[in-house]
Amino acid sequence: MLDIKWIRDNPKALVEALAKRSWSAGEAQSTVDDLIARDEARREHVTELQTKQERRNAASKEIGNAMRSGDAALAEKLKAEVGDIKTFIQNGEARERELDKALTDALAVLPNVPLDDVPVGKDEHDNVVKHIVGKVPTRSNWVKEHFEIGEALGMMDFERAAKLSGSRFTVLKSGLARMERAIGQFMLDLHTTEHGYEEVIPPLMVRDEVLFGTNQLPKFEEDLFFTPHGEGRLGLIPTAEVPLTNLVREEITAHEKLPLRFTALTPCFRSEAGSAGRDTRGMLRQHQFYKVELVSITDQDSSLAEHERMTQCAEEVLKRLELPFRTMVLCTGDMGFGARKTYDIEVWLPGQNAYREISSCSVCGDFQARRMDARYKDKDGKGNRFVHTLNGSGTAVGRALIAVIENYQNEDGSVTIPEVLRPYMGGLAKIEAK
């Protein structure tokens, strides 16, 4: 959530930021004008309430003076005034809550402001290559896509998955099931033992306010799955970013404890409401998938350096797996709602003859912290400031499995197991059809 004081002082800058995110000039200007009007109405009302409270306090003292001087008529008149003010304040406090909610609701649908060095663009075609790692091999005529290989091995079953759950689900078996588990364990071990992340096993169902904190709600409600719980509901996490980031919600962290670095391997659940017709075959876009998430909580001075570090941690996964990839700087029009800057890591898939996203690493500034009320103590201990939050995939496990299958496939239909995964698979070197 953006700072209303910043908006008040920089309305033109916000209009320009929204335009960079592909808002029309008219929509951006009217939105900012509406926000400022809501803010002014709230501030005027609060000022009026404060004036009434001051008058009530003064009148209460005057009642005592009138009683002591024997002026009963004045005392009664003042008592009536105090009673009227009390009623006004009670109604006014309810109105203040309404104005607060209206302002918060308006702020909640505004995206974050991109950093100055983010390339301006409309969509993925305007993203910029940061660097390329690994050589893309010449495509052989026998190369297949992951689902063709998996089905031929008898270890990837989409038909039975559809019988169980419908479309966009997969049943993995035998060697491929074992390799997906190995990939997740390898990633966790790398991030915890070498990259300094603390492993967490979080809840997979969370409250609405937690989803609001990491900006899934209200904007992306249709992408989520919910289950009834008591008189309300719980949402299934679309990413472990949600519970990991919210670990610091409504807390004040000591400065010397920062940065906090968390990682988790969890299933993720997404309705893929906006993805009809995209990647309908295979495992690329699923309702349920495993992902290793990286989350960092930093002070306001360290977040940009932490963003570079986090991205390098995610890239290291692909380097160890010896998979070709490229890292992209997302343009303003393709960047996520809560991000100030995002790097997408795209792994090479020979079967598709294309790079596909496997990780997205974003720095959010204090955007999520304001929604969560997550702060830290200043170095001097005199004040509290909002933390900065970062999140990234370290990486998507299912997509890493896809990349391994396609890049390590052999002409006979077998899949060579990357060296780094073999200790997790009992020394096995190859997956073959039974």
Curated annotation (Swiss-Prot):
Pathway: Aminoacyl-tRNA biosynthesis; selenocysteinyl-tRNA(Sec) biosynthesis; L-seryl-tRNA(Sec) from L-serine and tRNA(Sec): step 1/1. It is an enzyme of class 6 (ligase). InterPro entries: aa-tRNA-synt_IIb (IPR002314), aa-tRNA-synth_II (IPR006195), aa-tRNA-synth_II/BPL/LPL (IPR045864), Ser-tRNA-ligase_type_1 (IPR002317), Ser-tRNA-synth_1_N (IPR015866), SerRS_1_N_sf (IPR042103), SerRS_core (IPR033729), tRNA-bd_arm (IPR010978). CDD domains: SerRS_core. Keywords: Aminoacyl-tRNA synthetase, ATP-binding, Cytoplasm, Ligase, Nucleotide-binding, Protein biosynthesis. L-serine binds at residues 239-241, 293, 393. Transmembrane segments: none annotated. GO terms for molecular function: ATP binding; serine-tRNA ligase activity. It is found in: Cytoplasm. Its EC number is 6.1.1.11. Its main location: cytoplasm. One of its GO terms (biological process) is seryl-tRNA aminoacylation. GO terms for cellular component: cytoplasm. SUPFAM superfamilies: Class II aaRS and biotin synthetases, tRNA-binding arm. Pfam families: Seryl_tRNA_N (PF02403), tRNA-synt_2b (PF00587). ATP binds at residues 270-272, 357-360. HAMAP family: Ser_tRNA_synth_type1. NCBIfam families: serS. This is Serine--tRNA ligase. It comes from Mesorhizobium japonicum (strain LMG 29417 / CECT 9101 / MAFF 303099).
